[in-house]
C-alpha cells in the first residue's frame, strides 16, 4: 500500500482508494477496497482530524486478509504522523 495525505479545511477525514486493474479482476479489486474502507471506518476516531488520504493498493495487497490490510494502513498512518496510538 501507498498513502498520500493532504491537509483539508474540514473537521473530518476523507479517504480515497485506488486499486489498479493490474492488481486483479473486479472482484479482487473491490474486496481490497472494502477491506481498506472497513479498517479506516473502525479506526477513524484514532486518526487526527482534517486530513484527506488517498491509499493506492499495489500487487502485494492481493490475497491479504483483513488484519494484514488493517496493520498496513495503520502503519502508514503512523509514519505520516496522523494516527494516535
Feature roles, as predicted:
Residues 1-85:
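Positively charged, solvent-exposed patches that mediate nucleic-acid binding
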Amino acid at each position: 500500500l501507498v498513502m498520500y495525505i493532504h491537509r483539508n479545511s474540514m473537521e473530518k477525514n476523507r479517504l480515497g482508494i485506488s486499486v489498479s486493474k493490474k492488481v486483479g479482476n473486479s472482484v479482487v479489486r473491490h474486496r481490497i477496497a472494502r477491506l481498506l474502507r472497513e479498517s479506516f471506518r473502525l479506526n477513524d476516531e484514532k486518526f487526527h482530524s482534517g486530513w484527506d488520504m488517498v491509499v493506492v493498493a499495489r500487487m502485494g495487497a492481493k490475497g491479504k486478509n483483513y488484519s494484514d490490510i488493517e496493520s498496513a494502513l495503520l502503519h502508514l498512518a503512523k509514519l505520516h504522523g496522523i494516527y494516535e496510538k
